[in-house]
């Protein structure tokens, strides 16, 4: 495997909270995929702070992923096309859908993600990998 790209992002949880207040909670529906949204609602029901931390980590992971694949938040990279879910072991994993999944498959790109949060910040780091030769050329 060759490294296709790396991305990192840090977000201040209070900024996410402010956006949630400003949008009456619609920000979560705009950013989270369907599986993420179910987890968010379950966590938020138990603890508003844990729900907010979950939203902040997923937002951060999407930003880091978009940097790792070199697209930023431009088609086919959309908020809801990429979800960060957890394996049974708890390890986070990225799951792409739709046109983003097709774009990644065409380039042989897979990714690893790590996320962490504290009271004030959430941070994510993504390594995008490819088995294809000439990885640097296919990003263009």
Curated annotation (Swiss-Prot):
GO-annotated cellular components: cytoplasm
Catalytic reaction annotation: apo-[ACP] + CoA = holo-[ACP] + adenosine 3',5'-bisphosphate + H(+)
Pfam families to which the protein is assigned, alphabetical: ACPS
Stated role: Transfers the 4'-phosphopantetheine moiety from coenzyme A to a Ser of acyl-carrier-protein.
Protein name: Holo-[acyl-carrier-protein] synthase
Family, as annotated: Belongs to the P-Pant transferase superfamily. AcpS family.
Keywords: Cytoplasm, Fatty acid biosynthesis, Fatty acid metabolism, Lipid biosynthesis, Lipid metabolism, Magnesium, Metal-binding, Transferase
Single GO term (MF): magnesium ion binding
Positions with a binding annotation for Mg(2+): 9, 63
Compartments, record wording: Cytoplasm
Presence of the UniProt keyword Membrane in the record: no
Any GO BP annotation: fatty acid biosynthetic process
Organism this protein belongs to: Paraburkholderia phytofirmans (strain DSM 17436 / LMG 22146 / PsJN) (Burkholderia phytofirmans)
Keyword Transport: no
Obligatory cofactor(s): Mg(2+)
Organism domain of life: Bacteria
Entry's EC annotation: 2.7.8.7
